[in-house]
Amino acid sequence: MADLLGSMRRTHNCGVLRKEDTGKTVTLMGWAQRWRDHGGVIFIDLRDRYGVTQVVFNPENNAEVHKLADSIRSEWVIAVQGEVLERPDGMVNPKMETGEIEVMVSDLKILNKSKTPPFMVEDNAEVSENLRLEYRYLDLRRPRIAKNIMLRHQVGACVRAFLNENEFLDIETPVLTKSTPEGARDYLVPSRVNTGLFYALPQSPQLFKQLLMVAGYDRYYQIVRCFRDEDLRADRQPEFTQIDLEMSFVGEEDVMGIAEQMIAKVFKDVMGKEVKTPFDRLTYKDAMDRYGLDKPDLRFDLELKEVSSIVEGSDFKVFASVVKKGGMVKAMNAKGCAHFSRKVIDDLTAFVAVYGAKGLAWIKVKEDGSWQSPIAKFFTDDEKAAMAQTLDMAPGDLIFFVADNVKVTNDALGHLRNRVAKELGLIDENEFRFVWVTEFPLVEYDETDKRYVALHHPFTAPMEEDLDLLESDPGAVRSRAYDMVLNGTELGGGSIRIHQPEMQEKVFNMLGLGQEEAEEKFGFLLKALAFGAPPHGGLAFGFDRLIMLLSGENSIRDIIPFPKTQKAACLLTDAPSEVAFEQLAELALRIKKDPAS
């Protein structure tokens, strides 16, 4: 096949030329984005992943090239050679990085034609997400998406450079592994050579990185693909990428310290932003008490206050009965929000109902200091005074109350706090506020299964001072776990691990994993821990989520090259898809048909 390029070779990309390059002869290659004819002179915006350059075809310079340019259409692939000229006065485009120059073309080659695209390959084109994902290769040409993909590369390169400099080893772990379901479902892969047996795709490299610590590789990392068969949300994908770290001979502060340095380097080198270290610390208890959520957004105040002790003896039976049953009454002072209409309050009441709240009580403080509220009449002067002091009430304030069990109360008010902050414009979108949340509960009680389950995973070490509670009060045991939170979003989490087999067996037993089941699922880990496992810990960052936050995108699908839909489908390749009967037969599998279909 003939070489369409001939002697042409690209000298510059479409985003690099500036006024200083005037007079140079250059060769550019890319896609024709826009085509315009002004008085017989043809202007084409030539695009590649680096940017856009205006190229000009004047019939007086080369009539043959001009005639060929007249045939070019949107998204054709072309190569041009010509001279860089400074744009005439009044023709400079300040919106383009190359807007001070243009290239007067002397030679043109059409490298490939294109069908008419199903949508304009431009950032401002209105197009459905499904169509974008079906033609993802076109969507990836759009400057905004291309910028996100390049940002992804830059962050990955920065992370690797930092960890390499700090003596971490990039070690691959298996993709086909054993199914040890904890929480989310595993993706299963049938084995052809071992009929009836299955591999699982890893939800994380957790166990293998711990085994690497046992093996003596004291600093490990991977930017690794992980898989979870779970329902999708805006920030979830069935396959995702995480920055995975593990270190030996460390405590919590060592792991958090290296993670802070890594994130600070990413922000400085990639984003040009200085990040103050060390990051703030909040215990899980403090986070829940003050913000209602274990992922608090600290860019604004609006702290929550418990008022259970003030209202437990009040005549307002809704509050008093909740406290009597062991629940909680909590409040949030929305400063200066007494102007909120009843409709707004009704909307917020419906909002907290999503999180299980049965109602949203409220009090407006009028200019004379008196209360306007359906519940004001139920409180004595002493109770009012105590609430006013606890909640720092002042004229113009609006106080919201939720009374329910501890989980519902915190969940409802925590999300209400975020909602009100957005509506009041309290959030500085240019601020990056980090916080470590520490000392999570080791376990939580599952009401459905009537047993304790690990809050993070069953390999998390309990705090030394709580070991005596493992058998008597498991729910009170704090773990050596830590989450890094940025602007109310969990960036990553980790823990110090259990490194002694006796303690690991004890925790398994507390979680209802008998010796036989523990041996079946995790026998290889218990065996390894018995061969001199060092104290170790680590963490994993959600790489996709980090890129989403850095790029300012609202959907994780806009920062992944080839994402799945909310139904875990790839519209580009039409996956998942049926497979041939012969393939199933080789695996000794048969599809059970739905009787309703």
Curated annotation (Swiss-Prot):
Swiss-Prot/TrEMBL keywords: Aminoacyl-tRNA synthetase, ATP-binding, Cytoplasm, Ligase, Nucleotide-binding, Protein biosynthesis
UniProt site positions, description: Important for tRNA non-discrimination: 38, 90
PANTHER family: ASPARTATE--TRNA LIGASE, MITOCHONDRIAL (PTHR22594:SF5), ASPARTYL/LYSYL-TRNA SYNTHETASE (PTHR22594)
Main location: cytoplasm
Residues that coordinate or bind L-aspartate: 182, 228, 456, 497
Listed GO CC annotations: cytoplasm
Primary gene name: aspS
Name this protein carries in UniProt: Aspartate--tRNA(Asp/Asn) ligase
GO molecular function annotations of the record: aspartate-tRNA ligase activity; aspartate-tRNA(Asn) ligase activity; ATP binding; nucleic acid binding
Subcellular location: Cytoplasm
Organism: Desulfatibacillum aliphaticivorans
Assigned EC number: 6.1.1.23
